[in-house]
Regions:
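A short glycine-rich, Lys/Arg-flanked "PGG" loop and its adjoining helix->strand segment in the class I
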Residues: 260-275
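Conserved SAM-binding strand-loop segment of SAM-dependent methyltransferases
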Residues: 222-235
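N-terminal auxiliary segments of SAM/dcSAM-dependent transferases
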Residues: 60-138
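A short acidic, Gly/Pro-enriched loop at the edge of an enzyme's catalytic core
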Residues: 235-247
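Substrate-binding/catalytic lobe of Class I Rossmann-like enzymes that use SAM or dcSAM, i.e.
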Residues: 290-291, 296-396, 404
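Class I SAM-dependent transferase core
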Residues: 109-117, 123-173
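Conserved SAM-binding loop
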Residues: 214-215
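Conserved SAM-binding loop of SAM-dependent methyltransferases across substrates and taxa
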Residues: 186-197
């Protein structure tokens, strides 16, 4: 396998959105009933009945059947990071070069990575996620995404679980359904989806390290989910026509070089009438690439969230429609269209962790590469907060569509 580029420059330390969020209304329906609706319909024991939902003012429930065991997960990832080789650290740092590029600028891609740039991007993604997934597991972003803000009083992890349950509701999952998860990470979202609905998830991811963890976790949970190592830019997908009842992905599609080609392939493997859920990074109408402040914020934010492309909502909508999907919902899934409170929570936690790690490195209780890793991880979190509060970008843009 080709290696990530050996040298790169690592970056140093009024709503203009066209569509309002529906989330505040969604949550009033979802939060007591996200699990209870499946219990009522399918006999799954996931919480209290929703028979008195309309006048129920009790504390909202969140299904934790497949929630990560945080202490065990933390120490397992900590040990993995402790044992990293110098080459793994170097490859991880070098992999950030792809986030200074964009699929839309092929000339710069070729100039930086060479004519086989698509394969080089794939190699960089493996080097990047092979380390990043363990860094993220040191906090509440083991699933490697900042969720939409579904509940202002809840944690990052609880908002993740609320959003995942809303996906199941949006795409109508029921027991026995086969669901495709693109960019499945460690399989934690897939486990939660299966536990809540009784569906069976097939996950795809480019990183063998994460796939191995997903399989181990699924076996521990006693679930039937399965996982395949696959680069979404290497098509066709390894599935028969009309194989899946539904599809979802969370913040993976900026890594896709050819959205129309991928969506056509998804249409092939989905059954007629299947619904899909996309949650992704988009640039919003307020973003102006010619504005120096906007451009600098974008330069700092893309590496933080791991984005190669910078699609717009319209980019996704057109590609979906051209592939034969009808758009059912297209909006910002966060309350008030802002993720900043959750982004800031994660940033504050990891910056606090950074101080602990730097102290331990200083007294030689941790190896020096921990300083390199945590400094890179904590770089520019506030740039992301600022872009979100200025409504220039979001990673909580939601599209629900249906195969025609």
């Amino acid at each position: 396998m080709a290696q990530p580029p050996s040298a790169t420059t690592i970056p140093q330390v009024g709503d203009t959105s066209p569509r309002p969020s529906e989330t505040s209304d969604d949550v009033s329906t979802l939060k007591p009933a996200a699990q209870a609706s499946w219990k009522k319909k399918h006999g799954l024991h996931l919480g209290r009945s929703n028979s008195n939902h309309s006048n129920n003012s009790a504390k909202h429930e969140i299904n934790r059947t497949a929630s990560p065991k945080r202490t065990k997960t933390f120490w397992k990832s900590f040990k993995y990071l402790l044992d990293l080789t110098p080459k793994q650290v170097d490859d991880f740092m070098a992999s950030y070069v792809i986030y200074s590029l964009d699929w839309a600028d092929e000339e710069q891609m070729v100039k930086t990575l060479g004519p086989d740039y698509k394969a080089k991007v794939g190699d960089c993604l493996q080097a990047y996620y092979g380390v990043l997934n363990h860094l993220c597991a040191l906090g509440d972003v083991e699933k490697m995404y900042i969720p939409p803000l579904m509940d202002k009083k809840s944690s990052v992890l609880d908002n993740q679980m609320l959003y995942e349950e809303s996906i199941a509701q949006d795409i109508g999952l029921k027991p026995g359904d086969r669901v495709l998860d693109l960019g499945c990470g460690r399989g934690r979202v897939a486990a939660h989806m299966a536990a809540v609905t009784g569906a069976v998830v097939t996950g795809l991811n480019i990183d063998p390290n994460q796939i191995a963890q997903a399989r181990e976790f699924t076996e521990q949970m006693g679930l039937q989910n399965s996982f395949t190592i696959q680069d979404m830019n290497e098509l066709p997908l390894p599935f028969e026509d009309n194989s899946f009842d539904a599809f979802y992905q969370i913040q993976a599609l900026s890594l896709c070089k050819d959205l129309p080609k991928l969506f056509n392939e998804l249409r092939r493997v989905l059954k007629p009438g299947a619904k899909i859920s996309l949650l992704d990074w988009v640039s919003l109408p307020a973003y102006d690439a010619t504005n120096p402040e906007h451009a600098e914020l974008m330069r700092r934010t893309k590496p933080l969230i791991g984005a190669v492309g910078t699609p717009t909502p319209e980019t996704f909508e057109k590609a979906l429609k051209d592939a034969g999907f009808a758009i059912l919902k297209s909006d910002n899934a966060s309350i008030d269209g802002l993720q900043a409170p959750l982004i800031d929570k994660a940033d504050v936690y990891f910056r606090s962790l950074r101080q602990v790690i730097l102290g331990l490195v200083k007294v030689h209780l941790l190896p020096p590469h921990f300083k390199t890793l945590i400094n890179r991880l904590c770089l520019d979190g506030q740039a992301f907060v600022k872009m979100d509060t200025m409504r220039l970008v979001t990673t909580s843009y939601r599209i629900i569509a249906q195969k025609q």
